[in-house]
Design a protein with these regions (language model features):
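Active-site-adjacent "subsite" loops/lids of carbohydrate-active enzymes
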Residues: 14, 20-22, 26-34, 38, ...
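Active-site clefts of carbohydrate-active enzymes
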Residues: 21-23, 232-254, 282-283, 296-332
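Aromatic-lined carbohydrate-binding/catalytic grooves of carbohydrate-active enzymes
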Residues: 51-87
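Polysaccharide-binding and catalytic clefts of secreted carbohydrate-active enzymes
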Residues: 53, 60, 103, 132-274, ...
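Pro/Thr/Ser/Gly-rich low-complexity, intrinsically disordered linker/stalk tracts
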Residues: 362-418, 473-485
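Solvent-exposed loop/turn segments flanking beta-strands in beta-repeat/beta-sandwich domains
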Residues: 411-438, 461, 478
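Beta-strand-rich modules
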Residues: 452-476
Length: 485
């Protein structure tokens, strides 16, 4: 079945192919530096083979840090004890940036904005925000939450983001679905007094809570882009915005709602341009009675395509569910058929990286051999900058010992959006028309200014085309060279 499908799947030239690497599942807790690095290297190597081109790496799960910070303590999910530095000392965020960039992957730093203490955390560091400012937090269902209604918390989270973006060469900064806490029946959020004090302009506490988050999202976006305009801000909200019974534009679903239950007005953020990409977590299966995947992906494609739309995909649930049309198969192929029907969907983020590497139901093998077998550029973001770099200069094939290498020179630069940070390389056979919109000719995406060529007899004629890509993956005009291999 896999081989029969090979020719039927079109390769996208541009596609976000992401995977989340989380720390809150304890996969790194207490590992030695060497063992954690070995684990991550193995995961990244396998994900690279699977076609993944972006990693979303959790670096701030509970107002702590998987990087050295003057603002927040080291995370217990790294060392086993909050505030304890890793030994031997290392900086996981910087290390991951280096590792991802070396593999041609983007690195997006993933932070949880309001969550300050998870249920499993018993001891807080003396410099943790909950210890320093307990008056700015509330307890809910075993969690400690930075109260979104307190302006100092908004400023504080933005300061953390500015610190990360300023000090690190991250490609993006990412928040997931945790804003106000997930509701527990019969347990009210303890912010009524603050609403009475500060919410006079709002007719309901829900409107006030949504405004608190809206103000934060806008300030967060502006903070990141003021520091580095090319760093992308992404959010992966819960998979249902509103149900049809709550809103005329709601989806035909019956589940928890971003807008009403988490006070996250995701469509407002998309429509106002307060994020650069949106990744709704559509973790259900096709045919789910309360939250059908087919219904939801079509809903998000219709209503949330004002910014690049990627789909958050739970691969373990996908491979446990049968394809309604072909019950002998799981749902990976059926979901991919939906992507191909919806041009508004620009990519996928896989929950979660280790599960991909474990290859349940041959999910990763299908990516590697079929869907993501060819490299893909990231989606463009012309709404940040319309500029593109100049084309590469001085293309020259050179014999280096027994190898044949194509060299080129970076274009000249005046502004950040004219800098070439990567290059796309295409290959065309003799007589073929040069068409870089045809993704089948894209053979490599590299940060180097050279590429080793597959030399054979010296009698095969090819045209190699190289283009420059800036930090937003805008592509230059072509530079080309005829080569005999």
């Amino acid at each position: 079945m896999l081989m029969l499908s090979l020719t039927a799947t079109a390769q996208q030239k541009r596609e976000f192919r992401g995977a989340w690497i989380q720390c809150v599942n304890g996969q790194f807790q207490g590992l030695t530096t060497q063992k954690m690095q070995e684990t991550l290297i193995y995961q990244l190597d396998e994900l690279k083979k699977d076609g993944v081109n972006a990693i979303i790496f959790q670096v701030r799960p509970e107002c702590d840090a998987l990087y050295p910070s003057n603002l927040e303590p080291w995370s217990r999910f790294l060392t086993g004890q909050q505030g304890r530095a890793p030994q031997p000392y290392w900086d996981p965020l910087q290390w991951m940036i280096d590792q991802c960039h070396a593999r041609g992957m983007e690195l997006h730093a993933w932070i949880n904005p309001y969550r300050a203490k998870t249920k499993g955390t018993t001891t807080l560091s003396v410099n943790h925000v909950v210890v320093k400012h307990p008056e700015r937090c509330f307890e809910y269902d075993g969690l400690t939450i930075l109260n979104p209604g307190i302006a100092e918390n908004c400023d504080y989270i933005c300061e953390v983001a500015r610190d990360i973006v300023t000090r690190y060469d991250v490609d993006g900064i990412h928040m997931d679905d945790y804003f106000y806490p997930y509701p527990v029946a019969g347990v009210p959020i303890p912010d009524e007094a603050l609403y009475r004090q500060l919410g006079g302009n709002f007719s309901t506490i829900g409107d006030w809570r949504r405004n608190n988050v809206n103000v934060f999202i806008r300030q967060f976006y502006e903070t990141v882009h003021q520091a580095k305009p090319w760093v992308k801000v992404g959010i992966s909200p819960f998979g249902i915005y509103r149900n049809k019974r709550s809103s005329d534009i709601g989806s035909d679903t019956n589940g928890l709602q971003n807008y009403d239950d988490l006070y996250a007005d995701v469509l407002l953020w998309v429509n106002n341009g307060w994020l650069d990409y949106c990744v709704p977590q559509i973790y259900w299966e096709i045919g789910n009675k309360a939250a059908d995947y087919d219904t939801l992906i079509r809903w998000w494609a219709q209503y949330a395509s004002g910014r690049p739309l990627y789909i958050g995909e739970d691969i373990e649930r996908t491979v446990k569910a049968a394809d309604p049309q072909q019950p002998q198969q799981h749902q990976q192929q059926a979901k991919h058929r939906l992507y191909e029907q919806l041009p508004a969907v620009k990519g996928t983020v896989l929950w979660y990286a280790k599960a991909v590497v474990d290859n349940p139901g041959n999910y990763a093998a299908m990516l590697r051999q079929l869907y993501w077998r060819m490299p893909a550029l990231q989606p463009e973001m012309k709404f940040i900058s319309k500029n593109a770099p100049s084309k590469p200069r001085k293309l020259k094939p050179v014999r280096v010992g027994s190898d044949y290498v194509l060299f080129w020179t970076a274009p000249k630069v005046k502004k950040w959006d004219e800098e070439a940070t990567e290059y796309a390389v295409y290959r065309f056979n003799k007589g073929e028309k040069v068409n870089i919109d045809d993704a089948s000719h894209l053979i490599a995406i590299t940060r180097d200014t050279f590429l080793q060529l597959p030399y054979a007899t010296g009698k095969q004629h090819y045209t190699y085309v190289v283009t420059s890509l800036n930090r937003l993956h805008s592509e230059s005009k072509i530079a080309k060279k005829k080569v005999k291999l």
